[in-house]
A protein has these predicted regions:
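Carboxylate-rich, polar loop motifs that coordinate divalent cations or form catalytic acidic clusters
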Residues: 1-336
Length: 336
């Protein structure tokens, strides 16, 4: 409402924050300097731990940002307690002192207390997910980590299916949603009944919003929404409609505190307004140094303050708070 907008503006003025608060592409973006120490500008994954620290997975190491500075972790040849692989594909954690990493060569655990890495599993792993337990996907099998034995126990085998899992999500009814690289999405109920709500596509991500709807990003099939009653909507790019989703290559979704859904795609950042059903596009622009650093968005996460953090393919980390529409970001250094 207009009253809310005026209140927010007054609040911003009260804080002496200078920001041009306009919609769309005309938002003023602020940014951090290039010397923050991000190990590499291609960000595959972001994770926020229980202390609000941002973990950043890149092609060349793991980074930890505490709000002031960045510490990088990389492979050290003769150190068994170091990170065993520099390419960090996915990050998750147990919100209780442990961070789990999916790397090109397997799965690692970082213990915040000892500040040491431990290799949990070596070899090719396709998916990682944490919800009370650590789950991984390898080809057509799901395993759960057993902390007593330090082994991964088989949880489910998609028998007779020559597929590769790509992502996992456990909903509150204990349904395990399994995204694949070619066969869409399978759903395994708590009593191990298997269904296949989406039958085709390479699935990039599965996200559950506050109203328990699932938002599923795919490589070429656009964005899927699975409503709580089971109805499935598919959003596709329409070149004739500027308010359609900007790309059919959808990598990530995240809901802000206002109830809008932010969608990271190959061609830009979309904001989806559930009330109007319209998508608004934000892209990088060389003429706007205070804009997004890169239009290709890999991952989005939200912190306790409602700030959204974006990992980009070629522009480091961007972050902003939609409630104030002030944008800041890490910028790629010229030296990289």
């Amino acid at each position: 409402t207009e009253l809310v907008r005026k209140t927010i503006l007054l609040f911003l003025l009260f804080l002496s924050v200078t920001a041009v608060r306009t919609l769309g592409q005309n938002i003023t973006f602020s940014h951090l300097t290039t010397d923050d120490g991000l190990s590499q500008f291609s960000v595959n994954s972001l994770y926020i731990d229980e202390r609000g620290i941002i973990w950043i997975g890149t092609r060349e190491g793991l980074n930890r940002y505490n709000g002031n500075d960045i510490k990088s972790f990389k492979l050290k040849k003769n150190d068994p307690n170091s990170l065993f692989s520099n390419t960090v594909l996915r990050i998750t954690g147990n919100k209780n002192g442990k961070v789990y990493l999916l790397c090109t060569d397997g799965v690692a655990e970082f213990d915040m207390t000892t500040q040491r890495f431990k290799t949990l599993l070596q070899g090719n792993v396709d998916a990682i997910y944490y919800n009370e337990k650590l789950y991984i996907g390898k080809r057509e099998e799901v395993f759960v980590f057993n902390e007593n034995t330090n082994n991964f126990d088989l949880y489910y085998h998609l028998a007779g299916k020559d597929i590769n899992l790509s992502c996992l999500h456990l909903d509150e009814k204990k349904n395990l949603w399994m995204g694949t690289t070619s066969n869409g999405v399978y759903c395994l109920s708590d009593d191990k009944q298997l269904s296949q709500p989406i039958t085709k596509g390479n699935i990039a991500s599965i996200y559950e919003d506050s109203s328990k709807e699932l938002w599923i990003g795919s490589w070429e099939e656009g964005l899927y929404r699975i409503r709580t009653n089971g109805t499935i909507d598919n959003f596709r790019h329409d070149s004739k409609n500027p308010n359609s989703i900007c790309s059919d290559f959808v990598r990530s979704c995240c809901e802000d505190n206002l109830g809008n859904l932010w969608i990271g795609t190959f061609h830009g950042l979309n904001r989806y307004d559930k009330t109007t059903g319209q998508f608004q596009l934000y892209t990088a622009n060389d003429n706007k140094p205070d804009g997004l650093t890169h239009s290709s968005i890999w991952c989005i996460v939200k912190d306790e303050q409602g700030t959204l953090w974006l990992g980009t393919y070629f522009g480091g980390v961007n972050y902003f708070n939609p409630e104030y529409e002030i944008y800041t970001r890490y910028k790629v250094g010229d030296t990289e």
